[in-house]
A protein has these predicted regions:
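N-terminal beta1-alpha1 cap of cysteine-dependent amidohydrolase-like domains
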Residues: 1-143
């Protein structure tokens, strides 16, 4: 297909997505793109990125977070919260385990038992009255 061999970049599977920029840099993809677009740019400094990748690969703690909401049965309903928690975990050197708890199933009698293993609780906002009582019970729980 008339692509010069030196312009073929391998995109191997990586254990963690954060390893991809380093893999592409090691194949000089940045230089190829800059050259093709006739752009002069300084060399990439990857020290901080490499440190992040190393941290992500060597997390040595776990945090259990209870996410109490009314849309927990929908996989992507709290995607931005999930990703924010994962990234916060990187900062504190921890794998974050999220326990999705349906707020409609919480009440004053079961909330302490349901949240007892949580290191933290997040109650994302929602619309309407459905599940609000369980959210409030979670917020007020001091087990």
């Amino acid at each position: 297909c008339n692509v010069p061999t030196q312009n073929v970049i391998s995109n191997y599977d990586v254990e963690n997505l954060y390893e991809l920029p380093r893999m592409l840099l090691d194949q000089k993809m940045d230089d190829l793109v800059l050259q093709h677009l006739q752009i002069n740019a300084p060399a990439a400094h990857m020290d901080e990125w490499d440190a992040l990748v190393n941290r992500v690969k060597n997390l040595n703690q776990e945090l259990n977070i209870a996410l109490v909401g009314k849309y927990v049965q929908l996989p992507d309903a709290y995607l931005s919260v999930n990703e924010a928690l994962r990234h916060a975990g990187y900062y504190v050197n921890s794998v974050v385990n999220i326990d999705f708890i349906n707020s409609e199933e919480l009440n004053k009698e079961n909330v302490a038992e349901r949240l007892k293993d949580a290191d933290g609780i997040i109650v994302p906002g929602g619309f309407g009255d459905r599940g609000i009582a369980g959210m409030i019970d979670a917020i007020e729980c001091t087990y």
